[in-house]
Regions:
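ABC ATP-binding cassette signature C-motif
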Residues: 1-369, 456-741
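Hydrophobic alpha-helical membrane-spanning segments
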Residues: 157, 393-396, 419-420
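Alpha-helix boundary/capping and short turn/kink residues
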Residues: 245, 396-399, 422, 483
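Short alpha-helix boundary/capping motifs
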Residues: 284, 386, 415, 434, ...
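Extended amphipathic alpha-helical segments
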Residues: 298, 418-426
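ABC ATPase nucleotide-binding domains
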Residues: 367-390, 394-411, 424-442, 723-741
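Structured, non-catalytic alpha/beta "coupling" segments that mediate domain-domain communication
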Residues: 411, 415-417
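Charge-dense, low-complexity intrinsically disordered regions
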Residues: 430-470, 479-480
Length: 741
């Protein structure tokens, strides 16, 4: 017997206060497994998720094998984050209630909701915040302390009883909260049973509340509850021992070090951290807790490369936990994915492997199926021509043999057209490979389809400079922020950027990459001035800079002016000479079309759409030097690929600051996207053949230069480019991993 269950709850704020509705098919066995699970495997069939009348998933299957590591990929707006939140909030029917699911960013809120006696963020250090974020451990620690102090109290004989009852009451409160949640979401016979259980829980809770008010009890009950308190303490201590509670602080410190925190920053107050470091802190909270299912939504945001490599090694070595990750970082995703969940067309497709392997296999299958179909179409055309000739000859000469030949060939055409290869790669066998009732004797040849490629275009030829020369030249430049009694951020920097150059900056967070970009922009362009040294700029150079604050600035502006649209904002930035058709053309080239730019308020656009608006402001008209500081943060993998292809055509100079290895290699070092991202073949207007790759390699982009900013504020050119920096980052990550052990 199969039935459908339905659950509904308010969705997160970023969905505008709508509701998320989840439906799924469940058997009686599955329903029983929800209450008494034998494993932590998640298998949800016929799953549909709708947000505010917009369907994200439609009758698909979600299958998460216990302890396997998954990466979910899909374009921005397809609902990846919403799906993770639906799983974490318990909205998906069929997931056992006892399964502990942890979503990055939820840890602290859960602790506060559970009433854990935690310090306020104003007075809590980073280490305290991470240690105390584990609500289960914190509850056990508090209970153990309460019971120990009560049992050791030699004056008040009732103290252990009161502590025992108080803990029992608090646990009942948690059970009651969960009981309400279950009763609200179940219907039919199971809903009726859940409501009966809820009534019993409410009665027990009322009795417990009354027992807290009792001042005296008889000696027999006192003795029994004293023993119960001692037994409860032993149980709590055993639970703490099983979860290595004594090692919580050491583990938290090791994880924080791995994520790039220095010792002095670990002892800082959480309230003093910037937004990026707070995000790292929340990631540490998620990594230090036990969970059956760990959900990480874009965990590499704000991480530098050593921390990214440390994190991918940490996840690969994580045993016994199912991990589901969304990420825009292709290299990171490829490193951690044991299995891929592809979200497209409102379904989840499962593939055993990572994104690059999936794209390669899908592209190879598309080529194979295309060639097979073309060959069969040619054969079919020839047979149809022969049949037509036989029928004509039979009519002209009254030849029955020709009619029989035509009928025979027509039967052959109907029976033998279609897939010639079986499920296991051998010869097609009807009974094995095409069971059930079908209208033909061969399976139809299905060529895998691809999402339309994200194609970004913008003016790629900056105005002529009129006379030659370097765009920017830095000579012995040093910089220190005023009032800071420390070493300069940058020391003796020598760097020259010529027209059309490709320069990449790599280094740890805080090493001075953004500061160097600000110095290149100069004081007149909203940048910085050097403490010492000289910076010479071409007299006619125009520079544009995308910074990590570009999206925040647009968001703040849109919040103060909630009715302004992307089109109006772009035209205001350009000035009086702006023409609407030109502004629309620039925005359209970056993927923002029609009513999205003219009618939808800028404040309602997604992070990825705001990135495109920020780029439009920089690229109209195109500058001779374009500085991109972490431009990929809000973009999905397909959009990053589209941006890569557009930037490879850009004739101006590029200065790229990024931790994304794929982006650095393809934009700065000129490596072929066809080699690093097999899925780029699908962007070749359906021409799935080797010629596209060979043409790209023959065209060959001149490799740029990658520079590393050292901890001493110096800029050093990496002769081996990003490969050399990745080796340096890997060694740093290995040191951090050894510190963890």
């Amino acid at each position: 017997m199969v039935r459908k269950t339905k659950e509904s709850a308010p969705v997160a704020e970023h969905h505008g206060g709508g509701h998320i509705t989840v439906t799924a098919q469940q058997s009686r066995y599955a329903l029983d497994a929800v209450d008494a699970p034998a494993s932590k495997e998640i298998l949800i069939k016929d799953l549909s998720i709708t947000v505010a009348n917009r369907e994200l998933l439609s009758r698909t299957t979600l299958h998460l094998v216990e302890a396997r590591h998954y990466v979910m990929v899909g374009r921005n707006g397809t609902g990846k984050s919403t799906i993770l939140k639906a799983i974490a909030d318990g909205l998906v029917p069929g997931i056992p209630w006892s399964t502990r699911i942890l979503l990055l960013g939820q840890t602290r809120e859960d602790s506060i909701e559970d009433g854990i006696d935690a310090l306020g963020l104003e007075s809590e250090t980073v280490l305290q915040h991470v240690v105390r974020s584990d609500r289960v451990r914190e509850r056990y620690v508090r209970e153990a302390k309460m019971l120990s102090e009560a049992i050791e109290d030699s004056i008040d004989s009732m103290a252990p009883v009161r502590a025992y009852r108080r803990i029992g009451h608090e646990r009942l409160a948690l059970q009651l909260k969960e009981g309400h949640r279950i009763a609200e979401r179940r219907s039919g016979a199971r809903g009726k049973l859940a409501r009966k259980e809820l009534i019993k829980l409410e009665e027990r809770f009322e009795e417990s509340e009354k027992s807290l008010q009792e001042a005296e009890i008889d000696s027999t009950q006192l003795s029994e509850e004293m023993q119960a308190a001692a037994d409860l303490l032993a149980g709590v201590q055993a639970s703490l021992e099983l979860m290595d509670a004594n090692e919580a602080e050491a583990k938290a410190r090791a994880v924080l070090l791995g994520l790039g925190f220095k010792e002095d920053r670990i002892d800082k107050l959480v309230s003093e951290l910037s937004g990026g470091w707070k995000t790292r802190c929340e990631l540490a909270c998620a990594l230090t807790q036990y969970a059956d299912v760990l959900l990480l939504d874009e965990p590499t945001n704000f991480l530098d490369l050593p921390s990214i490599i440390w994190l991918q090694d940490y996840i690969r070595n994580l045993k016994g936990t199912t991990v589901l990750i969304t990420t825009h970082d292709r290299d990171f995703g490829d490193a951690v994915a044991e299995e891929l969940l592809v979200l497209r067309n409102q379904t989840l497709e499962t593939f055993r492997g990572n994104l690059s392997l999936y794209e390669r296999e899908r592209w190879k299958k598309a080529r194979y199926m295309t060639k097979m179909k073309e060959a069969q179409d040619k054969q079919k055309k020839h047979i149809e021509k022969t049949i037509a000739g036989n029928i004509k000859a039979a009519k002209d000469k009254g030849d029955d043999k020709k009619l029989k030949q035509a009928a025979s060939r027509k039967k052959k055409l109907d029976d033998r057209m279609g897939l010639q290869v079986g499920l296991k790669g051998g010869r097609f066998k009807l009974n094995r490979d095409l069971g059930g009732y079908h209208l033909s004797r061969r399976a139809e040849i299905e060529i895998p389809d691809f999402d339309p490629p994200v194609q970004l275009s913008f003016p790629h030829q900056p105005p002529d400079l009129k006379f030659p020369g370097a765009l920017v030249s830095l000579e012995k430049v040093s910089f220190a922020y005023p009032g800071r009694k420390k070493l300069p951020v940058l020391t003796d920097v020598n760097l020259t950027i010529h027209p059309g150059a490709r320069i990449g900056l790599a280094g740890l967070n805080g090493s001075g990459k953004t500061t160097l970009a600000s110095l290149i922009m100069g004081g007149d362009e909203g940048g910085l001035l050097p403490t010492s040294g000289t910076i010479a700029r071409h007299a006619r150079v125009k520079m544009g800079r995308f910074s990590q604050q570009s999206v925040e600035e647009i968001t703040a502006m849109a919040s103060s002016n909630p009715h302004i649209t992307a089109l109006r904002h772009l035209m205001d930035c350009v000035g009086d000479e702006a023409q609407e058709k030109d502004a629309r053309a620039v925005l359209s080239g970056l993927g923002l079309h029609g009513q999205t730019v003219s009618d939808v308020p800028l404040v309602l656009l997604s992070g990825g759409q705001k990135v495109r608006v920020a780029l439009a402001k920089l690229l109209w008209p195109p500058p001779q030097l374009l500085i991109l500081d972490e431009v990929t943060t809000h973009l999905d993998a397909d959009t990053i690929l589209g941006l890569v292809m557009a930037l490879r055509e850009y004739e101006g100079a590029l200065l790229v600051v990024t931790h994304d290895r794929f982006f650095m290699r393809t934009v700065v070092e000129g490596q072929s996207p066809y080699k690093l991202a097999p899925g780029v073949h699908a962007a070749s207007e359906g021409e799935a053949d080797e010629s596209s790759e060979s043409e790209d390699e023959e065209a060959g982009l001149a490799p740029g230069s990658v520079f590393r900013l050292t901890s001493k504020g110096q800029v050093r050119k990496l002769d081996l480019g990003m490969d050399e920096y990745e080796d340096i980052a890997a060694r740093t990550a290995a040191k951090l991993a050894r510190a963890r052990r």
